[in-house]
């Protein structure tokens, strides 16, 4: 494979033959804004292009604008940034339609419990259209896995924080596999070798380079080895948002030498380039054999040298020629139907939950221990006057603290949300499918978590006999579990920080618990805030009422009717039955799930706003949160 890039290409011949994508950007400026530091230019008048069949590497020191350039031309610029300039596809203003492009992020956000084969197969079922049979989708997945050199590790689990799995290089190749199943013509990769050793980096980049045929590939990369650098066709070298060099990667060494900064013998050229233009550690750099200049002076010399070179003129000429062409429009490809996506996601999520010990199994074990402790504490509570308080305390603990412990699954919720956000951003499926799948897959486990510990605590305590009473108790507990999980999923989708999410979720539940009507009876609650509206908003009120009515109605303790105990001791509203309380809880569950869906949809705006508020510098912007239609701007 040669990395020599011709100065010009006859587009009229190439475009019809391979249907490739020519991407150009001209006089591209990007400005980032922050509350603390105001506005700052991140990209400053960049011009360049990417062509089919070639790998363009965007290089530069940290903070040079590599990822910002990649995000801008990929249409993923963050909400706290503004851009100007032209970005054209095949010489036209058009959007990057689904299936025509793919973006591989720097982080490998994958489900750790799945095998490589499962991850790619499920992704194929989600992305590829219903018009394709299951065997055809499987064949595409197998070919993709083989193309990335993963056929020998297909049955190995990916692994993560919950257990050991495949290597970092293999994870990166899996991430790439998931994005090229639709055979996109344009592939963006953000730091594909980040965190990998030199050998793994080479094999990952070699696999990427092997995908170049008929495809335009653009990758931001920090410090490639000599072997990795040899795989690049074109090089875009940035420093402080300005172009230092754009042209054939093989000609970069000559350019630096002609500019007065030759690469020393036996030194990695990319190391020399980055060391020369890195202004973060300003130092005197040798020019020729005698003179020394500061880094800023060197950068200015290189930029002026580039603008006066044939390479600069070739770029301007090539961009102008591409822009004059009437290339093909990118058609949006179809993917699996909403029902298919919901079913596939449900199946995938169910398997993930079954294998992730921290999702439900560990919580089930803890719940069983607590239920045994609760049952032994209130064992055979009896019918004495003291049993009124004992029954109430036991039911309150079940409805409040057992459900409160759903925050234990928050780490798994966060991992789910990360995977969802990556897949949604890349167009694999929509928010509705995810919320439905999350709800359906969680129900069997939460039912199990409600029934087993609930039965232990219920029968050890000696609460009301009768199958109906226990079923109602379990239904209320199950519904409360679902409500709390919905609440925690809402928090996980809104709060970008793990610790903040735990604190926020626990804080919200604590306020609801305090206003539920047990720690202070309903009539004693302060009316502002605690009773109106919090008492009526908290699900604890209806859980307490339902469980207490289920237990005390029809019960006699020392010749006192259970109804009188409910009315006078617990100050329960007896104008409606316990089934109304259950219906209200079910309504709240539906409301919370709908709210979860709305928050997920609005998260593209809310989450970047939170990040922008928390950031201290425009350099900390995360540009992959909200895609903007930059091609229509």
Curated annotation (Swiss-Prot):
CDD domains: ABCG_EPDR (cd03213). Homodimer. Glycans are attached at residue 352. Residues 23-265 form the ABC transporter domain. Induction: In fragrant cultivars (e.g. cv. Mitchell and cv. V26), increases before the onset of volatile emission at the end of the light period, peaks at night and decreases when volatile emission declines early morning; this precise regulation is tuned by ODO1 binding and activation of its promoter. This is ABC transporter G family member 1. It is found in: Cell membrane. ATP binds at residues 60-67. GO terms for biological process: green leaf volatile biosynthetic process; transmembrane transport. Belongs to the ABC transporter superfamily. ABCG family. Disruption phenotype: Disturbed release of volatile organic compounds (VOCs) in flowers, including benzoides and phenylpropanoids, which accumulate to toxic levels in the plasma membrane. The chain crosses the membrane at residues 364-384, 394-414, 440-460, 470-490, 498-518, 580-600. One of its GO terms (molecular function) is ATP hydrolysis activity. ABC transporter controlling the release of volatile organic compounds (VOCs), including floral volatile benzenoids and phenylpropanoids (FVBP), in flowers of fragrant cultivars (e.g. cv. Mitchell and cv. V26). This scent, mostly produced in the evening and night by the petals, attracts the pollinators (e.g. the night-active hawkmoth pollinator Manduca sexta). Keywords: ATP-binding, Cell membrane, Glycoprotein, Membrane, Nucleotide-binding, Transmembrane, Transmembrane helix, Transport. The lineage of its organism: Eukaryota, Viridiplantae, Streptophyta, Embryophyta, Tracheophyta. InterPro entries: AAA+_ATPase, ABC2_TM, ABC_transporter-like_ATP-bd, ABC_transporter-like_CS, ABCG_dom, P-loop_NTPase, Plant_ABCG. GO terms for cellular component: plasma membrane. It is a multi-pass membrane protein.
